[in-house]
Amino acid sequence: DRVRVRLYTACQGSRIVEPTLCLVNDEPGDRAVPDKFNRTGFTTCEMKNFAWTDWLWDIPELSRANVQEIEFRFRISGKEVSDGDTVNFYIAEIAVERTEEPEKETGWAPRPGRLHYAQAGYRPGDPKLALVAPEDLPEDGAFTLTDENGNVVYTGEAKSMTWKENGFATLDFSDFTAQGRYRLQVGLLTSKPFPIAEDANHETVWQILNFIYCERCGCPVPGKHGLCHMDIYARHNGLLLPFGGGWHDAGDMSQQAAQTAETTQVLLQAALSFSNDTMLSERLWEEALWGLEFTLRTRFGDGVRASSLGLIRWTDNKIGSADDADNVRTQGQAMINLIDSQTEAMAALALPGRDDGLAWKCGQVAEEDFAFAMERWEKYGVELPSKWEHTYNASRCLHYAEIVRAAALLYQLTKKEGYAKTATEYADKLMACQQDEPSPCGVVGFFYRDESHKRLIHYNHQAREHLPVLALTELIKALPGNPACVEWKRSVKLFGEYIRSLAAYASPYGMLPAGVYQENEIEDRETFALEHLQSDYETEKPNYLAELRNGDDLGNGWWLRQFPVWFSFRGNSAIQLTLAAGAALTSQTLKEKDLKALAVRQAQWFGGCNPFAASLIYGAGQDSSEPYAIFPGKTVGAVAVGIQTKGNSDEPNWPNSVCATYKEVWMTAAADLLQVLSLIE
C-alpha cells in the first residue's frame, strides 16, 4: 500500500520542482487506474533541487491489481526567469512497501489515537468542541484543560454518541472562556498547545494572506518566481490590454478576472473587520489594492473587459516572441460588470481618507460598469460565458442577487434614487426565487435558479451559496427605513431556517451538509451541462440517482447530501464556506447567535476538527498534507479545493495522493475562508 522512490533532482535554476508519479493498471470500471476523469493514479511532490528525496506515496485505497506501468512525468512549462536549459532526474530505487497502519483516507469515524480539534485555537465566546474515538476515552470519560504551567484549569466529561453507525466522543468546553494557552488532555492523548483568545483567528488570516501574496501575477514573489506574464494580453477594437496582474487562479497559471475582483471584495471587507489589529488590517489593505488595480485595468471602457485565460506555462515577458498568449478571453456580459462594479463601489466607499483620488475614480467606474451591465442585461438576460469562466453556472437568481447588491452599494455611495429603485425591484425578483413556505420535504429558505421553482441552485466546485443573502443584507443596510425591509429580513430569516435544517443533519464535526436535492432534477439535461463540466449526461444520470440514495431520504423524492452531487470536479471547500458565510451574514443581520456558532464550526473544520484530524490549511497546525501546487509550490496558508467523496458515496474522502482537483490549491477556497473569518470576527 505504499510506493517509495528515491529520486535526485538536478534542474538548472528551478525554484519549484514538482514531478509526477503515476500508476496505470488494466482493470475495468471503478477499479481502473487512472479513473475516467484522471483524478486517481497520480501524485506530485515538491522536491529539493540538487538533492536526493525519498518520495513516499501511500495508496491504501487505490486499486493495485494488474498494474501495468509506473510512470514518471515532469511538465516542461516554459522558462521562469531563473530557469536554465536542462532538467535532469536520477532514479536510484523504486520499491513497493506495506505499512503497519495505513493512513486514513475515507470515512466519518474519528481516527483512533488522535484528537480532532481546532488547532489554531478558539475565541472565548465561540463553541469549543473536540472529538476522539470512543476507545480513547478513560473509563470515567473525563477530560481536562491544562495551562502553560501544567495546572488543570478545567475538567469536563465527554459525551459518547453514534452517528451513521460510527462512534464518537465529544469534548465540549464551550463554557471555559479564560484567555491563555492550553493543552487538551483525555486518556492518553494530549494536544499541542493552542490559544483561547480574542485574536485566535488572526494567525490564520496572516497565513492565508501569505498564500494570496504568493499567487500574485505580474509581480516578483521572492523564492517563487520573478516578474511574470507580461506578454499575455487581450485584443479588442484594435487595442491590446496586458493581462498580467491580480492573482493566479490555483496551482496553475490561469487567471480569472471575476475571481480577482471577488477576492478583492473579501480583502476590503476583511481590512475593515480586522481594523483593531493595525498591522494585519494594513496588510489586508495592501493586498486588496493589488487586486483593485487589476480590476480597474481589465476595463476597455466600453463595457467589454478582459476576463480570463487558461494558462499552464511561464512566458518570456517579451511581446512578439513565439510564446506570447494573445488569447485572453474578452466579454461584456452583465455578470462580469456587476461583479466588478461591486468591487469598485466597495473601494469607493472604503478609500476616502486613505486615497481620495482613487476613491473618486472607483466611484466613477462603478457607476459606468453598472450601467453597462444593466444595458446588457435588459437586452440579453442570462448569457453563457466560456465554460472555463467561474461564472459559467450563474443562474437568473444569481444575476438578480448581483444586481441588488451592486445597486445597494451604489445607493450608499451616491444616494441616487435610481439605484434604490433598481435594488428594491430586483429584490422582489430575487425573493421570488426562494422557497418561502415548507417544501414537500418540509425544508424552507433555499433558492431556485429562477422564479419557476423547477430547479434548485446547486454547486459542486465553485460556489456562491451566500450571495442572495449577501445582496439582501447589503440592501437592508442601504435602505433600513424602506417599508419593504420587513420582507427582506423575512427572506434572510428563511435562509437562516434553511441553514438550521441542514445543521440538523450534520455530523458531530459540525460540517454543514451541501444541500437538498430532488430526484427529478436529473431530467434537466441543459442545467446538468452547466453544473457538471466534463461529465457525460447519459453516463452520469444513473450515478446522480445513486449519489442521492447514499444521502438522507427526506421523503417525496427529496434527498439531503452531506457532500454535493458531483462527478469530475470534486472538492467541498467553496460549498461549505459560502454556506458558512450565509449563516454568518444572517446572524449579523438578525442577531441570531446560533447561526454565527454554525459559521464558526465551519472554520474549525478547516483548522483540524474534521474526520482526518488534519489542518486543511497548508503549514498551519498538524498533519496538513502537501497540496497540489505545480507552479506556486508548497505555500503556507494555501487552502485546497477540498475534501471529496469516493465514487457515489456520501462519506468524506481525503486521499494521500497529491493531485487535482481536490488537493489543488485555489484562490477561491482561500478567499472564502478569509471571508468567513472576517464575518465572525
Each language-model region and where it sits:
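Aromatic sugar-binding surface patches on proteins
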Residues: 49-56, 161-172
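Contiguous beta-strand segments within globular domains
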Residues: 1-4, 110-136
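Extracellular carbohydrate recognition
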Residues: 64, 78-97, 667
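Extracellular beta-strand elements of beta-rich domains used
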Residues: 57, 70, 89-96, 586
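Glycan-recognition and catalytic cores of secretory/periplasmic carbohydrate-active enzymes
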Residues: 101-105, 110-111, 140, 144-166, ...
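Internal, hydrophobic beta-strand segments that form the core of beta-sheet-rich folds
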Residues: 71-77, 187
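Extracellular ligand-binding interfaces
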Residues: 1-63, 85-87
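Noncatalytic modules at the cell exterior or secretory-pathway interfaces
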Residues: 62-72
